[in-house]
């Protein structure tokens, strides 16, 4: 009788709590969390979608080059944009406020670049996907903008807002994957894992081990 092949361990190339939570929703607990420290500065005239997929690939390939054992590396990068204008991952109150003002009353697009690399016997197999979601915020009052900024939940978030937090109350329209806006499109993630031989229906939880990239 043919034995079922054991799944390779999963490495998540991100310390994002949202991405960890999303993987947990589909019963995947990474064996390791290894944040990939890369330069995320957009290239000159780089558009949002190419930026997201490039950064996801760079994260995944960096971790693949650092590990010796066989594993599957999941990396993602999320970019919010109004038209061709890439919004920053806000780091200050003022950046959050500027982003929310720009999003108020209009549609924006959220792109997540997904890159999954299977490393086995020093051979790399790569799966890449760019996923787009359209989101529209209602017209926000100054009071709503100031209140949201006071929550600090938009700090370090693409476009200055946490879609699974209070900002969800601002959404009047959404088209596409909700998990994509949170940072990891689950439908595409499962499809990519399955294509690499990972059996998502027979996942054995593993103890989570937090690691950091070598500096």
Swiss-Prot record:
It holds the Pfam family Maf. Its cofactor is a divalent metal cation. The active site is at 77 (proton acceptor). It catalyses: a ribonucleoside 5'-triphosphate + H2O = a ribonucleoside 5'-phosphate + diphosphate + H(+); a 2'-deoxyribonucleoside 5'-triphosphate + H2O = a 2'-deoxyribonucleoside 5'-phosphate + diphosphate + H(+). This is Nucleoside triphosphate pyrophosphatase. Nucleoside triphosphate pyrophosphatase. May have a dual role in cell division arrest and in preventing the incorporation of modified nucleotides into cellular nucleic acids. GO terms for cellular component: cytoplasm. Keywords: Cytoplasm, Hydrolase, Nucleotide metabolism. It is found in: Cytoplasm. One of its GO terms (biological process) is nucleotide metabolic process. The keyword Zinc does not apply. Belongs to the Maf family. CDD domains: Maf. It comes from Rickettsia africae (strain ESF-5). GO terms for molecular function: nucleoside triphosphate diphosphatase activity. Its EC number is 3.6.1.9.
